[in-house]
C-alpha cells in the first residue's frame, strides 16, 4: 500500500478526444506536495507518511508547527494530511511528489468535504416522496409523515430519517478514472464529478477495490525522478 496525494479542487471542464467526443473532468492541482514526516512501527506503532500541501506564510503558522517544519527542513505548509502506507513505501522527509504518481486510466478513490446545504427537508435530504397533493392533505405536502409507532415503543428511534443538516461531511467517491495527467503544471484530471466545492482540499488514493495497475511508481512518483525521465 503506497501513499496517496493531497490536492486542491479547481473546478470542472472537459477534454476532447480524437474522435470529437468530450469527457467531463474535475481538475485537481498539486502545489508543492512534500513529505513532511513519517510514522514508524517502532516509534508510533504503525507506518505512515505525513504530506504537506502548498506554502504557508510564517505569520499563519503556530510556534509548535514552526518547530515541526524546521526539524525536517521543510517550508511551512498550508495543509497537513497523513496516509497509512506499507513498511516498504515510507518516503524520506522533503521528497516532493509528482502528478505522475497516478496513471491515465487508473481507478482512484477521492475523499473530500461535500458542499454544505444547510437545513434541508426530508424530500431533499433523503429523497422521500412526500405526501399527497390533495385528498385531505394541507400544508404538509413535503413533510416526511409519521416518525414513530404507538404507545409501544413510545419513542422515535435514533437515526430515523428526518429533516436536518445536509452536506458538509466527509465523502469518498470510489473507482473514478484518471483522465489526464499534466506533471509540468501539477494537474490531475479526474473523469466526472468529485465531492467538495471549488478550492477545497481532496485526498486521492489508489482504488481499494481494484488491483494496482502495472507501471505505477512504487513507492511513489517524485518530481526529481519525473524531471530525470523527461531529460
Curated annotation (Swiss-Prot):
The modification N5-methylglutamine is found at residue 151. This is Large ribosomal subunit protein uL3. SUPFAM superfamilies: Translation proteins (SSF50447). Belongs to the universal ribosomal protein uL3 family. Part of the 50S ribosomal subunit. Forms a cluster with proteins L14 and L19. The keyword Ribonucleoprotein applies. GO terms for biological process: translation. One of the primary rRNA binding proteins, it binds directly near the 3'-end of the 23S rRNA, where it nucleates assembly of the 50S subunit. One of its GO terms (molecular function) is structural constituent of ribosome. GO terms for cellular component: cytosolic large ribosomal subunit. Disulfide bonds: none annotated. PANTHER family: 50S RIBOSOMAL PROTEIN L3, LARGE RIBOSOMAL SUBUNIT PROTEIN UL3C. Methylated by PrmB. Keywords: Methylation, Ribonucleoprotein, Ribosomal protein, RNA-binding, rRNA-binding.
